[in-house]
Amino acid sequence: MALQSLRGSMRSVVGKRICPLIEYAIFPPLPRIIVYASRRARMQRGNYSLIKKPKKVSTLRQYQSTKSPMYQSLQRICGVREWLNKYCMWKEVDEKDFGFEIGAFD
């Protein structure tokens, strides 16, 4: 994998943008609409993004208590799948078994 794709983590950037949006929608209770549209973003779990995760979870729990409507559209969730298809075109990747083969799951 090229070094350019390992330099940054989108999770911390997305967390910085989404948390204020959700906090704004808590009072007064407003509907929340989020559309994800990533194009080949490498989603890595860096230390900084893992530190931000509890803040995102707690903010979402506060929003959930307001019982406001929520809509999330996952346009492209296949960034890793696209990478696998690019480098593993010669065989079909079975999503159920492939994670166990590479050691992603116990």
Curated annotation (Swiss-Prot):
SUPFAM superfamilies reported for this sequence: ClpP/crotonase
Domain CoA carboxyltransferase N-terminal, residue spans: 1-106
Domain of life assignment: Eukaryota
Its job: This enzyme activity is not detectable in leaves.
Single GO biological process annotation from the record: fatty acid biosynthetic process
Subcellular location: Plastid, Chloroplast stroma
Keyword tRNA processing: no
Keyword tags: ATP-binding, Chloroplast, Fatty acid biosynthesis, Fatty acid metabolism, Ligase, Lipid biosynthesis, Lipid metabolism, Nucleotide-binding, Plastid
Entry GO CC: chloroplast stroma; plastid
PROSITE patterns reported for this sequence: COA_CT_NTER (PS50980)
Protein name: Putative acetyl-coenzyme A carboxylase carboxyl transferase subunit beta-like protein
Protein biosynthesis listed as a keyword: no
Family the entry assigns: Belongs to the AccD/PCCB family.
Subcellular location, principal: plastid
UniProt gene name: accD
